[in-house]
Structure formats: structure tokens, C-alpha cells
């Protein structure tokens, strides 16, 4: 009988936070679907204060995930709870949650949109969220709501702005 | 004199308080009836009794005030009146100050304002207590600057098994056994594994900001505080962040992060009826079922009671140390809640969710189970069978199927 919490030993080696920031671990992985979805790449990548990222392509398709900074803080993911396909979710509403050895952490919708696809790979392999949070560890693919322009959505930040908030976190 | 006393009692200054006496007495009668709390709060009650019970001095003050129409022939009835009055006064002080239960609006005000405080729930309803915790957590303002709004809650639940948000309940508990021993089943809003509660277990919940949150922080404080109180307790932290005593687990923790805030809540086994716990945290038909699921599996641990300290002492000590350690400016107040007075629509909604079949039985992770003696493999998502070797089972509720498993073969 299975009785042990599954662990994926994929935790980052201890790296100083300063190095992490400078190395921009929170930038989108250019070799994975959230970036490669359209040939020209995403038009915009934005970040929330709750450590979600959103990558928006020209056809208004967007990918959402959580940042490297967040997954490092959460520790090894043991379960990823995602919304049902077809659900319309408003900005700030819960998009799901990630349970790690340390906590169940809520994920919030960065901008209004409808869920088109969820990353089903995470059902069996939640550790991918830790391994590649800015690429293969994407959570939800969605269609942005009519007239939503992430560059004008209040509360969304550029990578640079986001990483500045991390300095203030300490 | 009796006239004077009743006038005095009906004067505008006291009339409100007398109503309060009756209200709170009524609430207390109800709660006591419901949970047999008399003994439970005896320590704290007697502490305030010593502090506030009017002494003979109070009686003499009353007699002085009553001198103008003092009548020796009525002494005995007057003394009866005085003692009745003193009893009221005592009840007022005892309940009014020591355990003034917050109204819905008082609760809302303190939760939504910034600041640190302690809440002790006097309810033993697990649904109310988890909903209250959820309400305080959701409505605590994020502190962007300055000290964060640390909050500490205590609650004691009647018998129940509480599973983590992302657990497969069928794999964690035996519903039939729970029912036969009068344990409620709840799915909580936080992650982690399954725990059992009864009146000998105190739950504490420490709320802080996401930035300040660190899983082991509060348990380290508790260990320090309790060991300094009594070194014989020998409490320690294990690598998972749970509190242990002599290698046995006495406390289990779960954590939630949302909305820029986080909480760590945990159980503390003080004098729980552990005999009643045995066999409850096993799936039904363990030898016949083979489970496979994503989601979170409980880690089985040997448990014991702390002994030495009672639930009331634990709450009193941890509250007092919290008040000292976390004080920033001004005292950290202690508030009391119960499900009759300190309730609002948001708390009721969360209670409804926690009580709903939908949340208990039709959420949680996907799983599959192999029933060996029937040669069946059943796949379940959100409580419904979606795949099986036998077509006629597809679309059935797994709960109903398991309850009547023999009729399906």
C-alpha cells in the first residue's frame, strides 16, 4: 500500500538569492511550449505580486504558470490542482492550487480568460513544476477575455518590475 | 431595599449589562449543554473568579449606599437580594470580561482591521471552527508596510477525522468505522494529511504574511515555550516540522498560502481518547483493495498524548507567550467566538461547503482502485466512476458503489 508522500528530488542546489535574480530564473523558457506556441513568440510576459506569470500570444492565447522564485519557496510539489477546461475565470479568482511538502498554495488568475487546456502532464508528474516552472511546468492555457490587454491590466508587472519586488520581500 | 436594588439594576447604566448577562448566560447554557464545557474552562473560569468575584467589600459598599432606607427587619431578605445581586454581578464579570463572546459585527471589525490578536473559539463544531478560521484568514488585511497582522486561533473540535484538501478520502479513512464511532468526516481547505480530533486535542492556527511565513517557525516557538514551562515535556521537532515527544508524534501540521497571507494550523494531542482512534485511518477492505492515486498520501506516525498539561493550560500558556513575544504596540487582545453569536454569511457559506457532499465526496484527486476478489479495476474522478472493466458501473457514484459493493457482483 502506498503510504509515503511522493517526493521529487529536483530541488535547486542552494544558490544565493542574489544570483537567482541576476540570472533571471523567472524569465520564460524560450525552448518550451509557452514560448514556442506561436512562431514569433509571446507578445508579452507579465507577472503578478502573487508570483504567477502569464505569456500572451498574438491570437490572445495565454499560458499561465508560477515563477521560479515561487516554486523554490514552495518546495517539492506533490499535487497540482487545476481548473476544468471551459471555465471562465476572472482576474484575481482562484485558478487552482499547488500542494507541496510545505503547503497548499493558491494560484490566482492574472487576467480575465477562459481555460482552454490544462497541463495534464502535471497530474502524474507534479515535480515538473519545480524542474521547469517557466516552461514545461506551465499550468493552464487559456483564451484571454475580449478586450483584455495584459500590458494595461492593473497589477501586472514586467520581469524587471517583478524582480524588484522580490528584493523588497526580504 | 429590594426596591432600590431593582431600580438600581434597571437604571440605564445597568440595564444593557443585565440583558447581556441573560444573553450570554443563555448562550453559555446552550453551549455547555452541547459540549459539556464546564470542566474544560474550569481553570480559566476560576482564575477570573478569584480576580473578579466581589468580595465582602462590595457588599459593604452596597449596604452603605442603602443606608437611607435600611430596615433591620428586612435584613435576611435584603441579604438574599444582595447575594442574588452579587451572583449576577459575578456572572457578569465572569462571562462579561473573561469570555465576552464577539458579535458578528465585532468579529468583522477586528478581523478586517489591521493588528494582532488571539481568538479562542468556544464552539466545538468542527464545521464552525474551520469556517471561522477560513473567515479570519481570508479577511485579514495584507500588511504592506510595518509589522504583519499575526493572528493566533485556538479551537477544540468534537470527534472528527479531517482529511487534507488534496487527499483521496477512500484511501485515508474507513467511513463505516468513523460512523460507528461517531466521528464526523471533514475535508479541510489546507493541504497535508489526515488527522483525528476529539475534545482532548487542541488546534492552534498561526496566521502571518506570505513573506514572513516559514513552515517550522511557529512550532519552534511552541516547543520553546512549553519546554521552558516544564522541561519534563521534552518536546522536539522532527524533520517534517511536526512536534514529537519521545519519538511519538503529538502534533500534526498543515499549511495554506493564499492572497499574500499564510497560515500554519496544527493539532496538539493533550488528553485525547486514543483508543477510539485506532483503526480509523485505514481504507475500508484494506486487504482487498489496491489503490493508486495522485494527490497527497498521509504519512502514518505513532501518536501519543502530551500528558502533563490540559487543553486549557495549553491555550493559556501559548496565548500568554504569544501576547508577550508578538507584542508590537499595545497589548495583544484575546477574543472569544462561538457559533451562535460570532457568525455571518461568509462563515455560514464556508460551513455549508464543508458540510456538503460535493466538497467531501466529489472533490479531491483522481484515483484508481483494484478490487482483487472481484477482479475489477475502477477509475474515479471527482467521486464518479469514469472507467471500469464493467460498463454498467461507469457513471455511478463511487461512494454508493462502495457502500453496496456486494450487490454489484
From Swiss-Prot, chain A:
InterPro entries: 2-oxoA_DH_lipoyl-BS (IPR003016), Biotin_lipoyl (IPR000089), GCV_H (IPR002930), GCV_H/Fam206 (IPR033753), GCV_H_sub (IPR017453), Single_hybrid_motif (IPR011053)
Annotated Lipoyl-binding domain residues: 61-143
Coiled coil: none
Transmembrane segments: none
Cofactor binding, note field: Binds 1 lipoyl cofactor covalently.
Subunit structure: Component of the glycine decarboxylase complex (GDC), which is composed of four proteins: P, T, L and H.
Designated name of the protein: Glycine cleavage system H protein, mitochondrial
Organism whose genome encodes this protein: Saccharomyces cerevisiae (strain ATCC 204508 / S288c)
Lineage: Eukaryota, Fungi, Dikarya, Ascomycota, Saccharomycotina
UniProtKB/Swiss-Prot annotation, chain B:
Pathway: Protein modification; protein lipoylation via exogenous pathway; protein N(6)-(lipoyl)lysine from lipoate: step 1/2; Protein modification; protein lipoylation via exogenous pathway; protein N(6)-(lipoyl)lysine from lipoate: step 2/2
InterPro entries in the cross-refs: aa-tRNA-synth_II/BPL/LPL (IPR045864), BPL_LPL_catalytic (IPR004143), LipoylTrfase_LipoateP_Ligase (IPR004562)
Binding locations of ATP: 188, 193-196, 249
UniProt KW keywords: ATP-binding, Ligase, Nucleotide-binding
Subunit structure and binding partners: Monomer.
EC number from the UniProt entry: 6.3.1.20
Domain BPL/LPL catalytic: residue ranges: 146-330
Record-given protein name: Putative lipoate-protein ligase A
PANTHER family: LIPOATE-PROTEIN LIGASE, LIPOYLTRANSFERASE 1, MITOCHONDRIAL
PROSITE patterns, sorted: BPL_LPL_CATALYTIC
Pfam families: LplA-B_cat
Miscellaneous comment as given in the Swiss-Prot or TrEMBL entry: In the transfer reaction, the free carboxyl group of lipoic acid is attached via an amide linkage to the epsilon-amino group of a specific lysine residue of lipoyl domains of lipoate-dependent enzymes.
UniProt keyword Transcription regulation, yes or no: no
Presence of the UniProt keyword Ligase in the record: yes
Protein's organism: Saccharomyces cerevisiae (strain RM11-1a)
One GO BP annotation of this record: protein modification process
Enzyme class, broadest EC rank: ligase
Molecular-function annotations in GO: ATP binding; lipoate-protein ligase activity; lipoyltransferase activity
Transmembrane segments annotated in the record for this chain: none
Residues involved in (R)-lipoate binding: 249
Enzymatic reactions: L-lysyl-[lipoyl-carrier protein] + (R)-lipoate + ATP = N(6)-[(R)-lipoyl]-L-lysyl-[lipoyl-carrier protein] + AMP + diphosphate + H(+)
Amino acid at each position: 500500500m502506498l503510504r509515503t508522500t511522493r517526493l521529487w528530488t529536483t530541488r535547486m542546489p542552494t544558490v544565493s538569492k542574489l544570483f537567482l535574480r541576476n540570472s533571471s530564473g523567472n524569465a520564460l523558457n524560450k525552448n518550451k511550449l509557452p514560448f514556442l506556441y506561436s512562431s514569433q513568440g509571446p507578445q508579452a510576459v507579465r507577472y503578478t505580486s502573487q508570483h504567477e506569470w502569464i505569456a500572451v500570444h498574438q491570437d490572445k492565447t495565454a499560458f499561465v504558470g508560477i515563477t521560479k522564485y515561487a516554486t523554490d519557496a514552495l518546495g517539492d510539489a506533490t499535487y497540482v490542482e487545476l481548473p476544468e477546461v471551459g471555465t471562465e475565470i476572472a482576474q484575481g479568482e482562484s485558478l487552482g492550487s499547488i500542494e507541496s511538502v510545505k503547503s497548499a498554495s493558491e494560484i490566482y488568475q492574472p487576467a480575465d480568460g477562459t481555460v482552454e487546456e490544462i497541463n495534464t502532464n502535471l497530474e502524474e508528474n507534479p515535480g515538473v513544476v519545480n524542474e521547469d516552472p517557466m516552461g514545461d511546468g506551465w499550468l493552464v492555457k487559456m483564451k484571454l477575455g475580449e478586450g483584455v490587454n495584459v500590458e494595461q491590466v492593473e497589477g501586472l508587472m514586467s520581469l524587471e518590475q517583478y524582480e524588484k519586488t522580490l528584493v523588497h520581500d526580504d | 431595599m429590594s426596591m432600590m436594588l431593582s431600580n438600581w439594576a434597571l437604571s440605564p447604566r445597568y440595564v444593557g449589562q443585565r440583558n447581556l448577562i441573560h444573553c450570554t448566560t443563555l448562550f453559555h447554557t446552550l453551549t455547555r449543554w452541547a459540549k459539556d464545557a464546564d470542566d474544560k474552562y474550569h481553570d480559566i473560569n476560576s482564575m477570573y473568579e478569584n480576580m473578579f468575584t466581589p468580595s465582602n467589600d462590595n457588599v459593604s459598599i452596597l449596604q452603605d449606599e442603602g443606608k437611607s432606607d435600611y430596615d433591620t427587619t428586612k435584613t435576611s431578605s435584603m441579604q438574599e437580594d444582595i447575594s442574588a445581586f452579587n451572583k449576577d454581578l459575578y456572572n457578569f464579570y465572569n462571562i462579561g470580561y473573561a469570555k465576552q463572546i464577539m458579535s458578528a459585527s465585532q468579529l468583522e471589525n477586528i478581523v478586517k482591521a489591521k493588528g494582532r490578536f488571539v481568538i479562542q473559539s468556544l464552539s466545538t463544531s468542527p464545521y464552525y471552527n474551520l469556517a471561522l478560521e477560513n473567515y479570519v484568514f481570508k479577511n485579514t488585511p495584507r500588511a504592506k508596510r510595518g509589522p504583519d497582522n499575526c493572528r493566533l486561533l485556538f479551537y477544540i473540535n468534537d470527534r472528527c477525522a479531517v482529511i487534507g484538501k488534496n487527499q483521496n478520502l477512500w484511501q485515508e479513512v474507513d467511513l463505516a468505522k468513523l460512523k460507528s464511532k461517531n466521528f464526523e468526516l471533514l475535508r479541510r481547505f489546507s493541504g497535508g494529511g489526515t488527522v483525528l480530533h476529539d475534545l482532548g486535542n487542541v488546534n492552534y492556527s498561526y496566521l502571518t504574511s506570505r513573506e514572513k511565513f516559514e513552515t517550522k517557525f511557529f512550532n519552534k516557538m511552541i516547543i520553546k515555550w512549553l519546554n521552558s514551562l516544564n522541561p519534563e515535556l521534552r518536546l522536539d521537532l522532527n524533520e517534517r516540522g511536526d512536534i514529537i515527544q519521545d519519538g511519538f508524534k503529538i502534533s500534526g501540521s498543515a499549511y495554506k498560502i493564499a492572497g499574500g497571507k499564510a497560515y500554519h494550523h496544527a493539532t496538539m494531542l493533550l488528553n485525547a481518547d486514543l483508543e477510539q482512534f485506532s483503526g480509523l485511518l485505514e481504507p475500508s477492505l484494506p486487504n482487498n483493495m489496491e489503490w493508486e492515486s495522485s494527490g497527497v498520501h498521509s504519512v502514518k506516525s505513532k501518536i501519543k498524548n502530551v500528558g502533563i498539561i490540559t487543553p486549557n493550560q495549553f491555550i493559556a500558556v501559548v496565548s500568554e507567550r504569544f501576547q508577550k513575544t508578538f507584542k508590537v504596540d499595545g497589548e495583544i487582545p484575546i477574543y472569544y467566538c462561538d457559533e451562535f453569536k460570532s457568525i455571518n454569511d461568509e462563515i455560514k457559506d464556508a460551513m455549508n461547503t464543508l458540510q456538503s457532499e460535493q466538497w467531501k465526496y466529489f472533490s479531491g484527486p483522481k484515483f484508481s482502485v483494484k478490487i482483487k476478489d472481484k477482479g475489477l479495476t475502477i477509475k474515479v474522478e471527482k467521486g464518479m466512476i469514469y472507467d471500469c472493466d464493467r460498463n454498467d458501473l461507469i457513471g455511478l457514484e463511487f461512494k454508493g458503489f462502495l457502500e453496496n459493493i456486494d450487490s454489484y457482483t
